[in-house]
């Protein structure tokens, strides 16, 4: 009798695991397929906007008009004030985000890049993915827990399609919402979603991001103290960036209650700043600047600070886009500058800076390690891991996302349950 019970229990478990595999494999493929398609279109749209802006410098002077258009689109779609924080909240609660957020952020980000606002694309990808997943969750009438998992699938899928880092995308979507509480059951559906989205994006011609790090130094005491200096200073810069992003948004809302006026004024300020600095390097995402550091070792010491200013004004005024590419820009330029000061190659310093800045502003050390491997390869991975963990500790509870929940203290196992600031 006891053996029969064990056999029956084993059979039930096998069936449950097979059913979960088929169910979440199918849902992951579905969300990843659609997310990959939309994400690839989004990446191509941003690339087109960037090329058009480069070929037509006069487009910058239409930035205030673009701001008005973005506010109008968001009001038309009834998603004003909805962003990445609301997507995170949807993972933790029964609140979803409107499917109309996807076309709104798609169009808003494209306009921002076309006309010269300083923004990225990966934060927008998280919103598109969350919006698509919410739609499928309602369509299939999934329960609350399954909708949470599907939202993470959507986020990981579109992120992987846009940036070309499926491993980091899988873990980031799980890790970023509630730091310290890692939903391991979401790993399988998220990797199915991110891998399938990544594969489809490749087929559609979206090239993954990758940087060649030459002259990686030996792992010794002489190198390590230099890496630690870069990591700690990048952690401080990550706190400055988070503060600037939140303060910029609060200041614009305080000074200009009307959203249309806020966006128009922000556009004018970005135009004036661009004319003042005499370069277009800080408009758009800035991937070309990052590439030059790795390929030519060219870096300007003030670049990281100017990118913080441009991005905080752009996003604070109501323009749309992500914060991740600006984060990589700030990390690469600051890391490259510091590397020259301590006797390391700019490319190696840029890799260390990117890892430290990304971890400092997102509080996602595991995703940062995977991102470093996918972006730079394995040779510099140990240095990037150490830099990321040092920055994670020194950056405190600052975060780009006020909706991010930090479950545990960074100093002990004490449960604190605070939100990023």
For the regions a protein language model found, what residue spans apply to each?
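Alpha-helical transmembrane segments and immediately membrane-proximal extracytoplasmic
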Residues: 1-421
């Amino acid at each position: 009798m006891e053996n029969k019970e064990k056999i029956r229990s084993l059979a039930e478990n096998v069936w449950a695991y097979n059913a979960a595999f088929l169910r979440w494999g199918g849902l992951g493929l579905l969300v990843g397929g659609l997310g990959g398609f939309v994400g690839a279109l989004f990446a191509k749209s941003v690339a087109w906007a960037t090329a058009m802006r480069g070929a037509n410098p006069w487009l910058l002077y239409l930035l205030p008009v673009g701001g008005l258009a973005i506010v109008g689109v968001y009001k038309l779609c009834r998603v004003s004030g909805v962003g990445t924080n609301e997507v995170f909240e949807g993972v933790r609660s029964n609140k979803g985000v409107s499917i109309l957020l996807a076309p709104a952020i798609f169009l808003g980000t494209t306009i921002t890049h076309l006309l010269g606002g300083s923004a990225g694309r990966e934060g927008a990808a998280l919103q598109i993915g969350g919006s698509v997943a919410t739609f499928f969750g309602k369509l299939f009438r999934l329960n609350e827990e399954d909708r949470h998992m599907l939202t993470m699938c959507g986020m990981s899928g579109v992120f992987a399609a846009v940036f070309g880092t499926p491993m980091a995308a899988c873990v980031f979507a799980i890790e970023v919402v509630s730091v310290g509480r890692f939903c391991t059951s979401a790993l399988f559906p998220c990797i199915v979603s991110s891998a399938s989205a990544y594969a489809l994006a490749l087929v559609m011609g979206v090239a993954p991001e990758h940087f060649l790090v030459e002259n990686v130094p030996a792992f010794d005491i002489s190198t390590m103290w230099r890496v630690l200096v870069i990591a700690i200073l990048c952690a401080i810069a990550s706190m400055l960036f988070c503060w600037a992003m939140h303060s910029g948004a609060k200041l614009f809302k305080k000074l200009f209650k009307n959203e249309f006026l806020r966006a128009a004024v922000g556009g004018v300020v970005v135009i004036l700043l661009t004319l003042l600095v005499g370069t277009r390097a800080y408009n758009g995402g800035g991937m070309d600047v990052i590439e030059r550091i790795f390929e030519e070792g060219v870096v300007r010491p003030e670049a990281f600070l100017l990118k913080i200013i441009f991005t905080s004004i752009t996003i604070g005024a109501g323009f749309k886009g992500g914060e991740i590419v600006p984060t990589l820009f700030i990390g690469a330029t600051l890391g490259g500058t510091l590397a020259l000061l301590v006797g390391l190659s700019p490319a190696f310093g840029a890799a260390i800076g990117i890892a430290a800045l990304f971890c400092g502003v997102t509080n996602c050390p595991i995703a940062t390690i995977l991102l470093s491997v996918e972006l730079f390869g394995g040779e510099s991975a140990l240095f990037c891991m150490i830099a990321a963990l040092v920055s994670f500790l020194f950056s405190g509870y600052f975060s780009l996302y006020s909706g991010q929940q930090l479950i545990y203290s960074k100093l002990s196992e004490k449960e604190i349950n605070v939100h990023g600031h």
